[in-house]
């Protein structure tokens, strides 16, 4: 890999310039990097949208409270002239306007609501409510954001690698591993937030977080992928059809179970069964996909075969190009739902410290090799694309054998790999280069978490900010990416779960304190701030995937990752609660969460229609449309939760 000495010019190049100054030539597919300023702008935009929604909620709450307070003061003035008696109080209530009696009634309801809002087994805060309202709440906000980062690091650097080892030990197929263990690794914060909401805070914060995270993944993530992609990406229908079909069924079940405000144990078991049905389908996903495509595209395959047979030598290059452009689509279409949980997320610390687009820099080291070509070679991007690469290679081979003779197309694939190597390299040199590339990949991939001091001021500042999180994890958890620590994967697995539970508890607790200070419920905090915060790592890695041209992976993973949340993140805590409490039902009554789930279902349909309207392309218009839908969802959900507007369907 070409290296450049860090100078003032290279630092300026890294921050500002699109073209290199000192001869470090970038690959033609690598134009811009996801610089830190873009990620900061992304986070600011998410916080701004959520804050705007919360401000609207707070405004309506303040207006209602001021009206009630004014009526209460006015009623007190009427009886201030003489000593209040029980008769005076009864006469006052009888002669008042309909709004006046709510002064005492509202006080009682407000006290009950305060007790309801403040309930939960949280420790006593260091700051009183008045101190938090005078500015101390900013510390809780900073701590909450810090917990978002902590959850991302512990999941990506320790939990997901330990799950990878477990899948290898159990010899689980790649599709099933992606739908189970890797999905659990990516959705662990939402799952533990739901557990805390059921057993500790006794609120619907988990439901709000999962529903809000689902909408965030579908609308905001897809919108960001459409805006940040280097080119207009064409999408294939299979992954979207597969995941959306399961997701729609799961949402319909959830809506039906929500109708009576109670979740019975068998309803939780039904949702878990739906998840196992999805896992079973993923077990045979390759066979089902190939069978469906064979039935639907039989005529197209025959045309491609006859066309190739008619003109073999003049169209050989064109056929190779078609194969190169088709293979990535099949790889994306057939990939498991949790792509960036296994491919990208276990390098989040490197994303924060060293580079925000690691695969882009690695692409530049392969000279004339294209990204899609490297994806077809065994050994390239071995660890970072461990699960994805196996699935992609398997699907490419199935595609080749289905279209024509497997051997003929395999030879073409091999010829393409030789053709894209520099012509000046002979066979031995080419093998040497391939060997060096594999060594570089192994060194990069198998290298455990490094706490080495960075070389630039920006990286050093980020390093110091993240070190209080990384160092305790590095000390307490064995890094299974180190071959000597690989055998300690059970310690890493259970230790990561403990850290995730601890960080999730702090996140929900501080979110509760922030909501209590501002005057909003935990459900709204879950729908907005917590949902966005727990989904930021998925957002960043999905954008990176989209910038690599893998639009299908970004879309299918956005939808597929929500299946785990709906069918495991919600029903598992409910089922555990029912088992512990003699199978008693779980109360899920909430002002706006039911309509929020219905709204999520409607937004999912809008996403499908929008993608179809854009002719299955991820363009800028689709991105802005997704942003608009997400903004509408936030506003409507907050207004529903605060009863500013009434839910048309009463439960």
Curated annotation (Swiss-Prot):
Positions of transmembrane segments:
39-59, 135-155, 180-200, 207-227, 246-266, 460-480, 488-508, 524-544, 563-583, 593-613, 621-641
Q: Where is the composition biased (Basic and acidic residues)?
A: 104-122, 304-322
Q: Which GO terms describe its biological process?
A: calcium ion import across plasma membrane; calcium ion transmembrane transport; intracellular calcium ion homeostasis; long-term synaptic depression; long-term synaptic potentiation
Q: Where is the composition biased (Polar residues)?
A: 93-103, 323-338
Q: Which residues lie on this side of the membrane: Cytoplasmic?
A: 1-38, 156-179, 228-245, 481-487, 545-562, 614-620
Where do glycans attach?
112
Question: Could you tell me where this protein is found in the cell?
Answer: Cell membrane
Q: In which tissues is it expressed?
A: Retinal cones. Found in the cone inner segment layer and in a subpopulation of ganglion cells.
Catalyzed reactions per annotation: Ca(2+)(out) + K(+)(out) + 4 Na(+)(in) = Ca(2+)(in) + K(+)(in) + 4 Na(+)(out)
What's this protein's function?
A: Calcium, potassium:sodium antiporter that transports 1 Ca(2+) and 1 K(+) in exchange for 4 Na(+). Required for learming and memory by regulating neuronal Ca(2+), which is essential for the development of synaptic plasticity.
The family annotation for this protein states:
Belongs to the Ca(2+):cation antiporter (CaCA) (TC 2.A.19) family. SLC24A subfamily.
In Swiss-Prot or TrEMBL terms, this protein is called Sodium/potassium/calcium exchanger 2
Record gene name:
SLC24A2
């Amino acid at each position: 890999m070409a290296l450049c000495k860090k100078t003032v010019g290279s630092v300026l190049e890294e921050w500002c310039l699109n073209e290199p100054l000192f001869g470090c030539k970038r690959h033609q597919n690598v134009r811009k990097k996801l610089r830190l300023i873009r990620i900061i702008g992304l986070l600011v935009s998410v916080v701004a949208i959520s804050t705007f929604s919360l401000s609207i909620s707070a405004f309506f709450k303040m207006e209602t409270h001021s009206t009630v307070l004014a009526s209460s003061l006015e009623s007190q003035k009427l009886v201030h002239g003489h000593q209040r008696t029980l008769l005076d109080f009864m006469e006052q209530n009888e002669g008042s306007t309909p709004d006046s009696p709510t002064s005492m009634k509202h006080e009682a309801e407000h006290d009950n609501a305060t007790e309801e809002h403040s309930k939960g087994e949280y420790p006593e805060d260091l700051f009183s409510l008045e101190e938090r309202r005078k500015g101390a709440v900013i510390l809780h906000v900073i701590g909450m954001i810090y917990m978002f980062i902590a959850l991302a690091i512990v999941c990506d650097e320790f939990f997901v690698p330990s799950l990878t080892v477990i899948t290898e030990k159990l010899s689980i197929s790649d599709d099933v591993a992606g739908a189970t263990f890797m999905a659990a690794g990516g959705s662990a914060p939402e799952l533990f937030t739901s557990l805390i909401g059921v057993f500790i805070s006794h609120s619907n914060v988990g439901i709000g977080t999962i529903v809000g995270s689902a909408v965030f993944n579908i609308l905001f993530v897809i919108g960001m992928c459409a805006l940040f992609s280097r080119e207009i990406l064409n999408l294939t229908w299979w992954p979207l059809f597969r995941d959306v079909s399961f997701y729609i069924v799961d949402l319909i079940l959830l809506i039906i179970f929500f109708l009576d405000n109670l979740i019975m144990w068998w309803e939780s078991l039904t949702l878990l069964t739906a998840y196992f049905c999805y896992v079973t389908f993923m077990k045979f996903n390759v066979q089902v996909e190939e069978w469906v495509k064979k039935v639907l595209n039989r005529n197209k395959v025959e045309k491609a075969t006859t066309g190739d047979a008619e003109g073999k030598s003049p169209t050989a290059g064109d056929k190779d190009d078609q194969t190169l452009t088709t293979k990535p689509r099949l790889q994306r279409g057939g990939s498991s739902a949790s792509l960036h949980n296994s491919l990208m997320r276990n390098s989040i610390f490197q994303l924060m410290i060293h580079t925000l687009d690691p695969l882009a820099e690695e692409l530049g080291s392969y000279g004339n090799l294209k990204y899609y070509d490297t994806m077809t070679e065994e050994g390239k991007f071995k660890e970072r694309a461990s699960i994805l690469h196996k699935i992609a290679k398997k699907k490419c081979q199935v595609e080749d054998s289905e279209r024509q003779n497997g051997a003929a197309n395999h030879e073409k694939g091999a010829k393409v790999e030789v053709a894209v190597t520099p012509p000046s390299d002979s066979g031995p040199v080419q093998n040497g280069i391939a060997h060096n590339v594999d060594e570089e990949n192994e060194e990069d991939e198998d290298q455990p978490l490094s706490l080495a001091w960075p070389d630039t001021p920006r990286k050093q500042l980020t390093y110091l900010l993240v070190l209080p999180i990384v160092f305790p994890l590095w000390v307490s958890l064995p890094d299974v990416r180190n071959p000597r620590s690989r055998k300690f994967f059970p310690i890493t697995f259970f230790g990561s779960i403990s850290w995730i539970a601890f960080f999730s508890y702090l996140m929900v607790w501080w979110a509760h304190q922030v909501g209590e200070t501002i005057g909003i419920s935990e459900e709204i905090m879950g729908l907005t701030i917590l949902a966005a915060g727990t989904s930021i790592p998925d957002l960043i890695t999905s954008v990176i995937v989209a910038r690599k041209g893998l639009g299908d992976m970004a879309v299918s993973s956005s939808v597929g990752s929500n299946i785990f949340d709906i069918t495991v993140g919600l029903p598992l805590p409910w089922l555990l609660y029912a088992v512990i409490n003699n199978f008693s039902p779980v109360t899920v009554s909430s002002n706006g969460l039911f309509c929020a789930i219905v709204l999520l279902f409607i937004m999912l349909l809008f996403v499908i229609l929008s993608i179809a309207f854009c002719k299955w392309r991820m363009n800028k218009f689709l991105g802005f449309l997704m942003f608009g839908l997400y903004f509408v969802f936030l506003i409507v959900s907050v207004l529903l939760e605060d009863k500013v507007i009434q839910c048309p369907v009463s439960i």
